[in-house]
Design a protein with these regions (language model features):
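Patatin-like phospholipase
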Residues: 2-99, 107-351
């Protein structure tokens, strides 16, 4: 079945379901179209963790702009370059939200961790438990989300997360996931996550791609990647509910990209896999239309000066990439583009 099915297409789809709001109560990138090997750890010239981490200081930032991170799987390594550049520049935002890989970038930005912005992606390339087709056939998912989200973020683990800084942030945070039994997009905020465990299970749910990864239960309800929701992978609906109409949207696809519709055999696979969740099936089928509509809306808002779109000039990797050298290339390319665009971003924020 896997040989007939293109993960990049199944996971790149979403339905116009209602947005459920839970007091600030997240991914569905398309994954790879071919197997890729995990890199040799010996070739990895980075430390396992950074014992000298200090949160990046805040020096300035707008009070009326929401920062929105698109989903995109490992393509988020490219946009992580922008996360680092903005942190190094001392920027902060009153509202930050994301879906799937956008959830990872959201959390690293709010925790102001310049080291983890890179390592959250590079660290997976040499972790034998992170995923791959071997993980998929054993039922753990192409990306082993249980390991990635629940067993790497503690202080003594491979990619420690600065929970103290994150949880103390005055920023409004929104992470979105798709609830499979009701067809709702649910957004969670800091008020829903009093512990790091509460955050991690929600980040995991936000990033659990249909077909390629198991559903994740949160408070007894089944969730998958939030990118199958009504916007196709952009938390702009959550930003609007919170009163923000000026947006910096960080995208993982280049200018001109549009999602193609699903093929008939892909739809049949979804229907066989999820007979108990018709809302999920329809959401995945509808995602190309929803995604394309959102992109067109954002481009229109950009023409009015209400939105800044950071788009990769060229995306060098697929969303399921696990090769160290490819991830480094993507991150460095994103870093270089972000440094070139920072003056334009700063001008937009000040306008």
């Amino acid at each position: 079945m896997a040989s007939r099915y293109s993960p990049d297409r199944s996971a790149d789809m979403g339905r116009e379901s209602p947005v459920r709001w839970r007091h600030g109560t997240h991914r569905l990138p398309g994954v790879i179209s071919r197997p890729v090997p995990v890199s040799d750890p010996v070739q990895r010239p980075v430390p396992v963790s950074d014992p000298n981490h200090r949160p990046a200081p805040v020096t300035h930032g707008p009070d009326d702009v929401a920062l929105v991170f698109e989903s995109g799987g490992m393509r988020g390594a490219y946009t992580a370059g922008l996360v680092r550049v903005m942190l190094e520049a001392g920027l902060s935002f009153p509202w930050v939200g994301g879906i799937s890989a956008g959830c990872t970038n959201t959390c690293n930005f709010v925790s102001r961790d310049t080291w983890r912005t890179r390592e959250a992606y590079l660290g997976l390339t040499t972790d034998p438990q992170a995923g791959g087709w071997g993980s998929f056939v054993t039922g753990k998912g192409y990306f082993n989300s249980e390991h990635i989200y629940l067993h790497t973020s503690a202080p003594d683990e491979s990619i420690p997360f600065d929970w103290e800084t994150f949880s103390a942030s005055p920023t409004t945070v929104r992470l979105g996931a798709f609830r499979c039994d009701t067809g709702e997009e649910v957004y969670w905020g800091l008020e829903d996550m009093p512990t790091m465990a509460d955050l991690l299970v929600r980040a995991r749910a936000s990033s659990s791609m249909p077909v390629l990864m198991p559903m994740v239960e949160v408070d007894g309800a089944p969730y998958v990647d939030g990118a199958v929701g009504p916007t196709g992978g952009f938390a702009i609906d959550a930003a609007r509910v919170d009163g923000y109409d000026k947006l910096l949207v960080v995208m993982t696809r280049p200018e001109g990209y549009r999602k193609p519709p699903m093929r008939r055999h892909e739809i049949e696979i979804l229907q066989r896999l999820y007979p108990r969740y018709p809302a999920l099936v329809q959401a995945v089928i509808d995602r190309p239309e929803n995604y394309n509509r959102t992109v067109e809306e954002l481009e229109h808002l950009r023409s009015q000066g209400r939105v800044y779109l950071f788009r990769p000039e060229r995306m060098p990797i697929a969303n399921g990439e696990l090769r160290y050298d490819r991830i480094v290339t993507a991150f460095e390319a994103g870093l270089a583009q972000a440094r070139r665009e920072l003056p334009a971003i700063e001008a937009f924020l000040a306008s």
